[in-house]
Structure formats: structure tokens, C-alpha cells
């Protein structure tokens, strides 16, 4: 059992990398772990490499860390891009239906092929390969998959119970496949005793909250990555406190409004 675990998922933008990381991070947080996440993305709507890293511990963590124990790769670029972060004996999960993984250099790293797409298809839809990957990760980290149900319910509940059930099936298929084919695990440390006494928030949410608490009551902005999340958060909060959000036609107009 390690004192902390570094986990990352990567692939092309538009493959659901952020939602995969969010579901895993939120579930871990609700289980009582401290998590610090970091998202890497390119200034493109679709395509280009993106990844989502989570540092998991039962103690407070204040940065995303340097070490990586588990990497979920939806393409070879993810392996190449993050190879130097992987620790000795770490695990790389890759989709055998998408590509045949290879090591950029010879190191003690375990390449574990899992038919993520095929298992997702078995669950009902290939788009659920992300939940299969979460199930594989839960197995590697020795987590109880039933604890993911509330998060999956929150994420997909509006689409109906059938969708929730299908995603949980996908998650379990991933867990069971890895458990029956591999014997490599990175169990997480014991959970923190004070479950629920720490918050889960993104840096953008924290920035928006800080602006609101500091007295900001007007935001003029033009939506552009990565600041758009701050704008969206304040759209939902400023009107409750007598404030307003104005979307300008460009950045210069937003500056002039302010």
C-alpha cells in the first residue's frame, strides 16, 4: 500500500477525458480521500492531446505531484507524452480495440491491454468506454465500485435510470475484466476519518467564489478557455447577490465595460 497514488487519463480532446477524471475524482473525494486534480488541454474544440491527473492521499495535498502510478491511455500519444512521470512498476491501461501500445523506452512499466471499447459495447454503447476505464482503475486501486453509484447517478440521472444502470454495468465489466486477467494493484491508503469535512472545488470555482466573497458584483467577459468556467459559475451566483454577468462580443469590449 502506497502513501499516495498518482492517476491520469489521457487521449484526444472530445473523448470525454474531463468527465472521466471528474467522476473518478468526485467519487474518491466522497469516499473520504484528499484529491488534487490538474487538467492539460490544447486550445482546440476537438482533437489534440488532453489529460486529467489526480493525486490521491489520505492527507492534505496542495499540488498535483510528479509521480504517476496508473495511466489510462486512449492513444499512444498519451503514453509517449506521460512516460517520464511513470514510476517503477506502474500500470498503463490501454484500449486494445483502438491501438497496440508500445514502450517509448525500456522501463519497468506494465502495459495492460483491456478491450475498453468492446466491453462498453457489451454494456450497451461504446461511448461508455470511459466508465469501463473507471472500473479498471477502481480495481487497481482496490475500491468498492458500489461507492461510485451516487456519482454516476448525479452525472447521468437526468437521462433516466436505464442510462445510470448501463454505466454501472460498464464500470463493473471493467473491474471484473482486470481482476480476472491481471494481478497488479496500487491499493489506496486508509480513508481519512473526517469524511465530508473537506471541500471539492476546481480552481476556477474557487476563483469565482473568491471574487464573490471579495465584493465583486459585476463581470464583463468573453468566453474563452480556460476562463469560461469562472464566467459560468458566476452566472449562477452573482444574480443571487444583486450582481450581473455581461457577455461581451470580444475581450476588448469586456475590458471597456469593466
Question: How should each PLM-predicted stretch be described?
Answer:
Residues 192-258:
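Non-catalytic terminal/interface segments that mediate subunit docking, oligomerization
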Residues 1-214, 218-220:
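Active-site cofactor/cluster-binding pocket
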Amino acid at each position: 500500500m502506497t502513501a499516495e497514488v498518482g492517476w491520469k487519463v489521457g487521449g484526444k480532446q472530445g473523448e470525454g477525458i474531463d468527465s472521466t477524471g471528474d467522476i473518478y475524482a468526485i467519487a474518491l473525494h466522497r469516499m473520504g480521500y484528499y484529491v488534487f486534480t490538474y487538467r492539460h488541454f490544447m486550445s482546440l474544440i476537438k482533437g489534440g492531446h488532453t489529460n486529467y491527473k489526480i493525486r490521491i492521499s489520505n492527507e492534505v495535498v496542495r499540488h498535483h505531484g510528479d509521480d504517476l502510478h496508473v495511466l489510462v491511455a486512449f492513444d499512444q500519444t498519451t503514453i509517449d507524452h506521460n512516460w517520464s512521470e511513470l514510476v517503477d512498476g506502474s500500470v498503463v491501461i490501454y484500449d486494445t480495440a483502438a491501438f497496440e501500445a508500445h514502450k517509448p523506452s525500456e522501463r519497468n512499466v506494465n502495459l495492460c491491454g483491456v478491450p475498453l471499447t468492446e466491453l462498453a459495447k457489451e454494456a450497451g454503447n461504446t461511448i461508455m468506454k470511459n466508465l469501463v476505464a473507471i472500473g479498471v482503475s477502481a480495481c487497481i486501486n482496490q475500491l468498492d465500485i458500489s461507492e461510485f453509484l451516487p456519482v454516476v447517478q448525479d452525472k447521468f440521472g437526468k437521462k433516466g435510470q436505464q442510462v445510470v444502470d448501463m454505466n454501472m454495468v460498464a464500470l463493473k465489466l471493467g473491474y471484473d475484466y482486470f481482476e480476472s486477467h491481471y494481478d497488479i494493484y496500487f491499493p489506496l491508503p486508509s480513508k481519512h476519518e473526517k469524511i465530508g469535512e473537506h471541500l471539492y472545488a476546481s480552481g476556477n470555482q474557487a476563483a469565482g467564489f473568491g471574487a464573490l466573497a471579495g465584493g465583486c458584483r459585476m463581470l464583463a467577459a468573453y468566453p474563452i478557455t480556460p476562463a469560461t468556467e469562472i464566467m459560468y459559475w458566476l452566472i449562477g451566483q452573482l444574480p443571487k447577490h444583486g450582481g450581473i454577468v455581461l457577455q461581451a462580443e470580444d475581450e476588448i469590449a469586456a475590458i471597456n465595460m469593466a
